Amino acid sequence: LFDAAGLMWLRPTSLQRLLWPAARRFALVAQEFDKLVGEQGLAQGSSWLAHRMAAGTQVSGGDHVPATGPAVILANHPGMTDTVSLLASLASRPDLRVIALDRPFLRALPNVARHLIRVPDHEVGRMGVVRAGVKHLKQGGALLTFPAGEIEPDPATFGRRKAVDSLRGWSDSYVLFARRVPQTRFI
């Protein structure tokens, strides 16, 4: 994972030696998560990881997600635990693809990467993301997207107002999905 994060060029320092055990544990958990995703699917692997990360999670609104047919789930992104819990809650959609920023860490998880539509850092390739999303929706698939494109303020930490204000920065790219695949359900 250090290599995937582009950190292998760093010479060992006292700080690195101090952080190495925690980084190794994280890498082993990520490796096991990816293995489970390959064997059992994204939702099951995410459920395993969510239980490791949090004492408990409560998800509501899952009944709004249709079991079949084109669907786009728009979600805020306050952090990793929320994301993993959301993925675990979408077990009814094994066809789920996640629109996510292209990061070396995610590419280092091959089983997880198969469920992603990666958004490049540069705008040149972003229409390819829309085309891939539209194709998946036309095949009756489900998409999960985080329209802010970044980690957002957690309402539990920063307050509801700051979290709601962050929604103004959401991309309206989901409108393209609605135009191209009008029967899509948006949740």
Predicted regions and their residues:
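Soluble catalytic domains of membrane acyltransferases
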Residues: 56-187
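Membrane-anchoring hydrophobic helices of lipid-metabolizing enzymes
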Residues: 1-71, 81-85, 113
